[in-house]
A protein has these predicted regions:
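Ubiquitin-like/PB1-type beta-grasp interaction modules and other compact soluble beta-rich domains
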Residues: 1-29, 41-64, 72, 76
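Generic intrinsically disordered, low-complexity segments enriched for polar/acidic and small residues
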Residues: 18, 36, 43, 110, ...
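Short, electropositive, low-hydrophobicity segments enriched in small/polar residues
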Residues: 27, 35, 67
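Short, structural beta-strand-to-alpha-helix junction motif
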Residues: 33-36, 84
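Fe-S ferredoxin-like electron-transfer domains
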Residues: 55, 61, 66-155
Length: 155
């Protein structure tokens, strides 16, 4: 769903760009950001909140919030609201499984009474328990997977 053409708009509607989002081909215009192209294609949920996995849509559009963080060409935590689309780029969602619309960990929202602020620091105090709990909690937080070879580290 696109707005009608505007005077002084930043996109070039005469030049199409294609990229992949979660394996699906998305049409964009030259000058689109990844997030604006996804929004124009009908997407409304861009991420999930860290603890309760509540749905998050576009918020700031300026790269100042975590709502649009995605994996772009293998690099985690890219702010897609300020990242221009490029032909052939590959984008994947983060912090939701199996999909953004149907995230199984969104059940955490219904179990919030079991997870007050800081519960993990008070509950998993034994070193052996914390070692296991830490990896589960970090994975649930969903801030992407950092490649072990450092191939996508931005300097």
């Amino acid at each position: 769903m696109r707005l009608p053409p505007q005077v002084n708009e930043r996109i070039d509607r005469s030049t199409n760009v294609q990229f992949a989002f979660n394996g699906k081909s998305i049409e964009a215009f030259d000058g689109d950001t990844v997030a604006s192209a996804l929004y124009a294609s009908g997407m409304r949920i861009f991420s999930r909140s860290f603890k309760y996995h509540r749905p998050r849509g576009l918020l700031c559009g300026a790269g100042h919030c975590p709502n649009c963080l995605m994996n772009v060409d293998g690099v985690p935590n890219v702010r897609t609201c300020i990242t221009p689309v490029r032909e052939g780029m590959v984008v994947h969602h983060q912090n939701a499984w199996p999909s953004l619309n149907n995230d199984l960990l969104s059940v955490n929202d219904k179990l919030d009474f079991l997870m007050p602020v800081g519960f993990y620091y008070k509950t998993f105090t034994h070193p052996r328990v914390w070692k296991i709990a830490e990896s589960v909690i970090r994975r649930a937080a969903g801030l992407g997977v950092v490649p072990e070879d450092g191939s996508s580290v931005v300097e």
